[in-house]
């Protein structure tokens, strides 16, 4: 009987710990869109919180439309970097399909900000500071 109670307690502690788990993003330069979508869909289901505490660039930014907003917070060090998708490492070629996938994974206020700053192009645009804090809560 004691073993059963102990196992039940351990299981409860494990569930509680995972319910309050946090994923921190410090320096994520992005990568393959498909890999990031799969990672963020799994993260969405996990219920984990996301703290952006540094650079989140390119495919990393798709978390904004994949993870519920109430589970994302940013620190004063947070910087989001947006650009058009590129199938080549040098970034000189633009992938229209990849850029459409990025765009579809941004919430409306982020799309509006991107549009005001020239849209998704090969040149990187940065969202940070007061403009970012107006969209996402500052982590406490």
Predicted regions: what is each one?
Residues 24-25, 34, 38-51, 90-140:
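Charged, glycine-interspersed solvent-exposed loop segments at helix/strand-loop junctions
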Residues 3, 20, 127-128:
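N-terminal targeting/assembly segments of extracytoplasmic apparatus and virion spike/baseplate proteins
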Residues 1-7:
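Bacterial N-terminal signal peptides that target proteins for export
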């Amino acid at each position: 009987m004691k073993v059963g109670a102990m196992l039940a307690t351990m299981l409860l502690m494990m569930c509680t710990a995972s319910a309050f788990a946090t994923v921190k993003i410090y320096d994520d330069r992005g990568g393959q869109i498909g890999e990031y979508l799969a990672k963020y869909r799994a993260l969405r289901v996990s219920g984990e919180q996301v703290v952006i505490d540094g650079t989140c660039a390119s495919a990393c930014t798709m978390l904004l439309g994949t993870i519920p907003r109430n589970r994302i917070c940013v620190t004063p060090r947070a910087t989001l970097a947006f650009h058009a998708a590129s199938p080549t490492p040098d970034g000189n070629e633009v992938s229209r399909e990849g850029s459409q996938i990025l765009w579809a994974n941004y919430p409306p206020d982020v799309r509006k900000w991107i549009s005001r700053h020239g849209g998704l192009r090969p040149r990187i645009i940065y969202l940070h500071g007061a403009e970012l804090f107006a969209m996402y809560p500052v982590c406490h």
